Amino acid sequence: MSNSIAKQLKMSYYPQLDNMDMADVSNFLELNEEKHHIGCRNWVDKYNFQPLAAFTIAYSDKYIYVDFYVRGNNLRAVNHTNNSPVAEDSCVEFFLSIPESKEYWNFEFNCIGTVNASHRETRENPTRLTDCEIAQIKRFASCGATPFEEKEGIHSWNLMIAIPFSLIGLDATNLPELIKGN
């Protein structure tokens, strides 16, 4: 059950992001964009701890960029193959809904950037992205890309992602006025 409240965000447009490496994009967004607090936590009955989490968001001519910032108890990144159950690890999730579409897009990432991604009309019937589709998603993880077992203690990490408009069926030259996300 989610405890989030709808909030409208305006994404800033930065065409130069497409010519920067992902670490530089992360630094740019940190300096130029407002951080938005993530107050939603899934699986409350299974996990009683809520990490501090925030994100920045912007777009370019080709991508939607989201930089997640997380600080929490323990850190885990065991899953390292596409569409593996990254929700078992330290992870973040991003949903997108395109106007006039019955489907929504679900992107789950663990702290090393492993992705479990799909599009679907309902939770029960996902169409998983292929390895070729997932390869189009740019990722930069402050934890690196090597899997590791759970590390105890307080840890901070960030994950910078870039999702191509073409992957989610949008024409970057004719974007809709509104894209829903959470």
Question: Which residues make up each language-model segment?
Answer:
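Structural preference for beta-rich elements and adjacent junctions enriched in aromatics
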Residues: 1-182
